[in-house]
Amino acid sequence: TVNHNRDQGMLKTDRLNQFKVNINNNNTSFRLNLNIDLSKGIKLVVNSFTTLDSYHGPLEDVRTAYSLAFYANPVDFAPTYPADDTYNWPHLRFGKSRDSDNPYALIQRGYVDRSRFSTINRLEYIQNLSFLLKGLEFRGDVSFSQAGYYSNPYMTTPFYYSLLDYDHVTGKHTLEALNPDEGKRTLLKGSGTTTGSNQLAYNIKILHTAAWKDHTTSYLAVLSGQESLQSTPNSVLDGIRRRNLGLSMRLSYGYKERYYLEGSFGYNGSERFAKDHRMGFFPSVGGAWVVSKEPFLLGSSKWLSFLKLRLSYGKVGNDGIIDTPRFVHLPSIGQDQPSGSFRPGLGQISRYRITGYQNNDVTWEIAEQANLGLETKFFNGLFEATVDIYQQVRHNVLANRTVIPE
């Protein structure tokens, strides 16, 4: 599918302006979803979504201009003045007082072009392996996403005037230039903004489900990897791709649709820590009991439709503990600005100093979590209630110590 939207504003460009300032916003999106049966039991899934946004509009925020217009006094100045005998060459003569701004000049003095794009593409391979084991399935997928944004402002310096004299009989007026040396009609490019990022991720999955008599089981194993890069790095280290690797498994068991047990773990790797601390093991276990399906509660099913108790405990790891430095196990060295020398006759010198000491003991921040929950429904779902008792304890929290305790 292809979709395109175009929105325009209601700002009028002055006839003496050499560029358009009205808002013009275009949005285009493309979406593709394909399911391809390669052969019996083998499927290929393709998903793609792309958006393109382009914006042209006034340099100043329209909300700011409207706010200034609300408080502007029309007695102080006119939006623009006609030419007088002195300032009669073709240009916009914006009115202004020394104590307030002209909102019309803010809108007409320049424009900004902005563009934003993003694309997400995913390819998945699915194969049914029931010929090896009933309920066994293999999945592998790779996805690529990219996003970018740029903004370029273009501006002039308005010519501001005040009304010095006005003859009510002849209608002749005299203007006073408030900024004759600073005003310019030439468009100048301001400081632009450019950002971008891309990410590549892949997953390999093994799934298995089975059911026999009163028993049900399910198994899932996932090997995942991810790498990302910012297109506008601030340093050499920021220009290196960020990478993560993980292996996770989950096994669940159910009996008579009343009793459930589940165990899982994640074995994750991060590049941010020293060699001995890059891998983290994070297990979890949980169970649930659907009390409403017990024989001793079947007589209350008219008013108690559902009652479930659940309990879980697990650990979750976090490697995004600090933005800077990126690699906490590497020292950081910075250069000071030139300053006075330590010895006469040497002039100014630049000094190098350690801005961050390496720490080989920093590792994953661990959130240890426990949860006790209750879910219930009354009168066939007319009333529902969910109650959770939750506790979380964090370990290995990284913090800056400003005062060393005695």
Which residue ranges define each predicted feature?
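Transmembrane beta-barrel wall of Gram-negative outer-membrane proteins
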Residues: T1-G57
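Active-site-proximal polar cores
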Residues: Y160
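Short intrinsically disordered, low-complexity coil segments enriched in acidic
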Residues: T1-D7, K12, N73-T80, F327
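Functional cleft and adjacent loop/helix regions within the main domain
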Residues: F77-Y87, I389-Q392
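Extracellular/periplasmic, surface-exposed regions of secreted and cell-surface proteins
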Residues: N33-L38, I42, S48-L52, Y71, ...
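The feature marks either
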Residues: N88, L92, R98-D99
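Charge-rich, acidic-biased intrinsically disordered regions
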Residues: L52, G57-P58, R63-T64, L164
